[in-house]
Amino acid sequence: MSTGSFLPGKVIANENLSQFSPEARKLIAEKTGVQTRRHAVETECTSDLAIAAARKCLQKIEFPPENLQGIVLSTSSPDRLLPATATRVQHELGARSAFAFDINSVCSGSSFGIAVVDALIRSETCKSILLVASEMYSKILNRKDFTTYPFFGDGAGAILFQAESGSSRGILHSCLATDGSRNDIICVPGGGTMLPFEKMPGPRSAYFRMRGEEVFAFSMDRGPQIILRLLEETGVTKEEIKCFICHQANINILHGIAGLLGIPKEKFIVNLDRYGNTASASVLIALDEAINEGRLVQGDLAVIATFGGGLSWGANLIRL
């Protein structure tokens, strides 16, 4: 197992968001904990971030890209409607022997991706597979919309999984869930077959939308539930978990989940203060940083928990 992450170099602090009033800018940190976020430059696209994170991941253990057998890319902000953004990642990495495809479960994408990778390895479809989560919300947000624009950032994370017979490391268990009756709570309304470009009432239909209060309530409800379900199904206690890596949506959600589960908040990895909400990339970026900082070492158990559009939510138990 190896990890990598990449954040674009453009740092946007709350005070730089001059389109909002000083009073509104003060509320950003109070409501969410976000102090800064990273934005890509005009010439960068989602696959560029994915490629950079993937290269870091592979170079860390000197793994040749041509030995990859599969690439799964989680993104809800793809380069184009089609083809899969993963195809450009495969080409630029030189992973000529790897199949490549995208998945889109919005902020839950990494949990769903981990479960897919686990199934592919267990079915012996492949022995080495790269999961990448890459998001560039800065280009799908309305910069004047205070309900979304200040809270998101761009970034990518990657993790390489390899089949190892007899090993106790890797993906131990996954739990996934969806409530499609609320699929409109987090969405980009226009651009698909439901609302084609030529029928869009205006450019605002192409922007990301979110009903924040409903998302907060959903996360506080289903986040703890999916973590408890994961622990119950595996027989692992919360005391045995070294770190909880939850989707980096809001510091109040993270602290709320910790309180509801009776887990010290120090066990929760937090980077949203620096990067904002990087959607499906958030947990893989946080995992990479936790490993690089020595908070997770070989043999440690970690829980990854995500919640987002669809509505969807998931959790994974991994051993480093």
Residue ranges and their predicted role:
Residues 66-74, 238-247:
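Short glycine-rich phosphate-binding loop at a beta-alpha junction
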Residues 1, 74, 104, 129-135, ...:
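Short beta-strand segments
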Residues 47, 51-54, 58, 77-78, ...:
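Claisen-condensing/thiolase-fold acyl-transfer catalytic domains that form or cleave C-C bonds
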Residues 1-42, 145-217, 221, 225, ...:
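Condensing-enzyme catalytic core mediating Claisen C-C bond formation in acyl metabolism
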Residues 34-38, 67-72, 91-104, 138-144, ...:
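Glycine/charged-rich beta-loop-alpha catalytic/anionic-binding loops adjacent to active sites
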Residues 60-96:
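Anion-binding (especially nucleotide phosphate/pyrophosphate-binding) glycine-rich loop
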Residues 21-30, 80-94, 131-137, 193-201, ...:
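Acidic-glycine-rich active-site phosphate/pyrophosphate-binding loop
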Residues 120-156:
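Flexible, glycine-rich active-site loops centered on histidine and acidic residues
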